[in-house]
């Protein structure tokens, strides 16, 4: 049997300039082996701004109160003095079905930042070979 990978991309948070308001999005990881969450941030508008905070949590349902942090490395700030992309890689083995990203910009009006988030799920597909293919007889 031959195995290969293919990626499914989802826009979790569309591009928006926001200040003071946290944005959240869920990623359904059913059937995936690995997830990458890319957080794209525009440059800070001024030097008084602080870096946005990013956290990733997990749950078996999409009920907001059931999500829990599973790795403290996924609760961090991402510096955006210049435009930047942060990638967060998650091995889904043993993880719950849903990942939730929370992006919190500067909590003052100084920190409006353009942001967007893309989730990429790597799924395994199995190609046919002589060991698992049906026999086709022509003629």
Which functions belong to the PLM regions below?
Residues 1-139:
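Surface-exposed, low-hydrophobicity beta-strand/loop segments enriched in small/polar/acidic residues
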């Amino acid at each position: 049997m031959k195995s290969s990978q293919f990626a499914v991309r989802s826009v979790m948070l569309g591009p928006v300039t926001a200040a003071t308001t946290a944005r959240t999005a869920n990623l359904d990881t059913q059937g995936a082996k690995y997830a990458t969450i890319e957080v794209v941030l525009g440059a800070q508008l001024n030097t008084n701004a602080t870096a946005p905070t990013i956290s990733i949590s997990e749950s078996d349902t999409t009920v907001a109160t059931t999500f829990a942090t599973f790795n403290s490395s996924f609760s961090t700030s991402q510096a955006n003095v210049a435009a930047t992309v942060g990638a967060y890689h998650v091995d889904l083995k043993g993880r719950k079905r849903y990942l939730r990203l929370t992006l919190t910009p500067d909590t003052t009006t100084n920190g409006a930042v353009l942001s967007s988030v893309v989730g990429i799920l790597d799924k395994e597909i199995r190609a046919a070979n002589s060991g698992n293919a049906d026999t086709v007889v022509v003629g």
